[in-house]
Amino acid sequence: GGNRAVSRQILDCTLRDGGYINDWRFGRKTITSILDKLECAKIDIIECGFLTGMVQEKECSLFNSTANIEEVLPKRERSSMYVAMIAIGEKELHPSKLTPYDGKSIEGIRLTFHKNEIDLAIEWAHIIMEKGYRVFMQPVGTVFYSDIELLQLVEKMNQLKPYAFYIVD
């Protein structure tokens, strides 16, 4: 029992999830404009796109470094938290290639992983946290987990202590 305060934060993933519609080709001006308007709207967490080892162009919300993301962030003082996604198994950027957190670019990494990638995801999460970033753990396809597998995953996440752990699907 007892009354526990519930805290909610809004996360906008337009530039990452929306990319499945337009192949992440938002255009540089649109990317900077969307980020600026989301900042003005005081959105809690703004996802800028994917961190990927793929070849990318400046017109896409696909980035191969946090420095590339820094270039599109609002230039004024920012109150929103900026993050990017690394999707294990999807032309991902290995976290060893991340530069240490310096406060100029993104603050966090959303890490997605499948059931067969849990141990790898935990290993990667440790690397990301050691570099100073907040890590958000997002298992993919949890509908295919048994109850016991979900409980075991929760236990592993409790040991890891990520900034956030959430179930989407």
Language-model features, listed with the residues they occupy:
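Conserved C-terminal portion of the radical SAM core fold
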Residues: L150-D169
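Short amphipathic alpha-helices and their capping/turn segments at secondary-structure boundaries
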Residues: N3, I31-C40, V154-N158
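Conserved, mostly hydrophobic/aromatic
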Residues: G18, L38, I109, F165
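Glycine-rich anion/phosphate-binding loops
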Residues: R25-S33, F113-L120
